[in-house]
Amino acid sequence: MSATRIQAVYRDTGVEAYRDNPFIEALPPLQESVNSAASLKSSLQLTSSDLQKSRVIRAHTICRIPDDYFQPLGTHLLLSERISVMIRGGYVGRNPKTGDLQKHLQNGYERVQTGELETFRFEEARSTAQSLLLIGCSGSGKTTSLHRILATYPQVIYHRELNVEQVVYLKIDCSHNGSLKEICLNFFRALDRALGSNYERRYGLKRHGIETMLALMSQIANAHALGLLVIDEIQHLSRSRSGGSQEMLNFFVTMVNIIGVPVMLIGTPKAREIFEADLRSARRGAGFGAIFWDPIQQTQRGKPNQEWIAFTDNLWQLQLLQRKDALLSDEVRDVWYELSQGVMDIVVKLFVLAQLRALALGNERITAGLLRQVYQDELKPVHPMLEALRSGIPERIARYSDLVVPEIDKRLIQLQLDIAAIQEQTPEEKALQELDTEDQRHLYLMLKEDYDSSLLIPTIKKAFSQNPTMTRQKLLPLVLQWLMEGETVVSELEKPSKSKKVSAIKVVKPSDWDSLPDTDLRYIYSQRQPEKTMHERLKGKGVIVDMASLFKQAG
């Protein structure tokens, strides 16, 4: 069997309510938060040898970061715990050993036969299913986190003694401009993928009404002991095709009550209006608990958020730039947050795009200025959403909360191609470019195996410069003599002549100032912001003494 389809092996959980329930005891063991975090965390690591590879190979490795990197935060552990409780709690009222499951199946059979959702044969058949509403902006990591958590469970468990294929979870997506009936069809489709069955052909393609479809879903869900039904992207549902928000709410409430299995609904803030009345209600009539999945915050209660610091510090280590800064500065971290607003997808992709830009430019270093430039050039599609988040106005946030960003993924691919198109120069190619004539290059090729380029090239250039009329055949003995004598040609070439003064200071172009160390005044100037003076930046870096605080300390 595959990793998602296993034979049942039963373990006592230690929880009395779960004892002797095969659907619960066949699940993976209950985990502490620390172990849960370890099981969710990605194993992506980079080595020093990765750093020495060609730019093309490094670019491909960098582009794997959005898919392979995952750092569990507090919200992930909360969601993991809620899912664990929902799955196991939902099975408490459907224990096949106590007859509870059979009661649900008999009630489901009655509903299918009569076509009425309120019909039952066993009134005392109780439901222990819980429901959950997960709301968050597009790119905040809801779906990625869910996939990570669900991947810690096998999807299908076969119970030989019961002859039952238990489906632990099922995830379906709402299509754009979809209808409520499409949710039912997607349910049968997803179940067929998990089990290799043909429920869609048997039930989905017939002209059943919504009530009949829900009755069929209920019966099949209980027949396969479905542990959790996840419906993602509910903001895509068409209100006009679904009869309006109230009709949609009624559908989801009925689905939770009738199917009798835990249901999780996921969407952006646009979907919140469907459940607004229920969320405002003190009684919570529909029973939807809610998690609002906000972007990670930069500060908490006026202090730096340690989760944001830990997340960015760990991500910063996944650099394949040869001139990278070992430690992430507060300045770069602050700019990173300002641009991304803590939206996880943007945080990671801004980092990846900045690395690719640094590779393409050849400076191989991420700076605050580079992050700003990449944000302006590459992330235009999500500027409205991020500006709405900066405003803090709920109406604006809801309007732009479901912006998708396929353009960013396209840019990742394009930057990979751009880097691949840049010709990687070998040391030999670079050396040949430094020499002026074919004769000089011929001499270099003859001697390059025996002498270091840093000495060989200036020696050849000096020989041709001092003897412009001699052929390379005649200059060869002279070059060899100088090389064997170990004459310090480089230092002589750098000596200023009488007729021409040569500055001993190497001039760095202003366009290259952002590649200097971050303590260099020129680097600090290159990272200036319009709203801050140079004096304020120097003061922030600790270059200028704060006289007021100094006098205060002196008393």
UniProtKB/Swiss-Prot annotation:
One of its GO terms (biological process) is DNA recombination. Keywords: ATP-binding, DNA recombination, DNA-binding, Nucleotide-binding, Plasmid, Transposable element, Transposition. InterPro entries: AAA+_ATPase (IPR003593), AAA_22 (IPR049945), P-loop_NTPase (IPR027417), Tn7_TnsC (IPR021542). Residues 495-555 are annotated as: Interaction with TnsA. One of its GO terms (molecular function) is ATP hydrolysis activity. ATP binds at residues 136-143. It holds the Pfam family AAA_22. Residues 388-407 bind DNA. Monomer. Interacts (via C-terminus) with TnsA; this interaction allows TnsA to bind donor DNA. TnsC binds non-specifically to DNA in the presence of ATP. It is required for Tn7 transposition. TnsABC + TnsD promote high-frequency insertion of Tn7 into a specific target site known as att-Tn7 whereas TnsABC + TnsE promote low-frequency insertion into many different sites. This is Transposon Tn7 transposition protein TnsC. It comes from Escherichia coli. The gene is tnsC.
